[in-house]
Curated annotation (Swiss-Prot):
It comes from the Bacteria. Its main location: cytoplasm. An accessory protein needed during the final step in the assembly of 30S ribosomal subunit, possibly for assembly of the head region. Essential for efficient processing of 16S rRNA. May be needed both before and after RbfA during the maturation of 16S rRNA. It has affinity for free ribosomal 30S subunits but not for 70S ribosomes. One of its GO terms (cellular component) is cytoplasm. Keywords: Chaperone, Cytoplasm, Ribosome biogenesis, rRNA processing. It is found in: Cytoplasm. The lineage of its organism: Bacteria, Pseudomonadati, Pseudomonadota, Alphaproteobacteria, Sphingomonadales. Belongs to the RimM family. This is Ribosome maturation factor RimM. GO terms for molecular function: ribosome binding.
Length: 157
């Protein structure tokens, strides 16, 4: 995987107040660890971030008023893959699983389409060749290898 590949950490979902703050939908647990983010062909310098409704409220140095904040609605904010912290053995980033082939007893059953966390652990959504999708619990049903995911047959529809 390219270390320069952009990884989306948040999306601007709207303006907050009159001073240029934005509401963010977060895809990371520690947004404050990243001071410079890219989006819409620009760089943004994170000044402050705090919990907010459905995510967080942030102030960026480059966004000075509500109009500028509203204009960025829908903008995805990313960092290079190389900016993410290193992983311990057995850990993974959700983005690293997306697109990997999924196999059951050596036979392909689909491709990893999405990873969700509903609170009890990660759940992998697999898309079959016919476009139908099914979900399996990562901790109980998935063995993660560098270039593929091995799925326990008991969890396959």
């Amino acid at each position: 995987m390219s270390s320069d590949r952009p990884i989306v950490l948040a999306a601007i979902i709207g303006a907050h107040g009159l001073q240029g703050e934005v509401r963010l939908k977060l895809f990371t647990e520690d947004m404050g660890a990243y001071r410079t983010l890219d989006g819409a062909g620009r760089s943004f310098t994170l000044k402050t971030i705090r919990p907010g409704p459905n995510g967080a409220v942030a102030r960026f140095a480059e966004i000075g008023d509500r109009n500028a904040a509203e204009a960025l609605r829908g903008t995805e904010l990313s960092v290079p893959r190389s900016a993410l912290p290193p992983l311990a053995p057995g850990e993974y980033y959700h983005v690293d699983l997306i697109g990997l082939p999924c196999l059951v007893d050596g036979a392909p059953v689909g491709v990893a389409a999405m990873v969700e966390d509903f609170g009890a652990g990660d759940v992998l959504e697999i898309e079959k060749p016919d476009g139908k999708r099914f979900m399996v619990p990562v901790a109980k049903a998935v063995t993660i290898e560098p270039d593929r995911l091995l799925i326990d047959p008991e969890f396959v529809e």
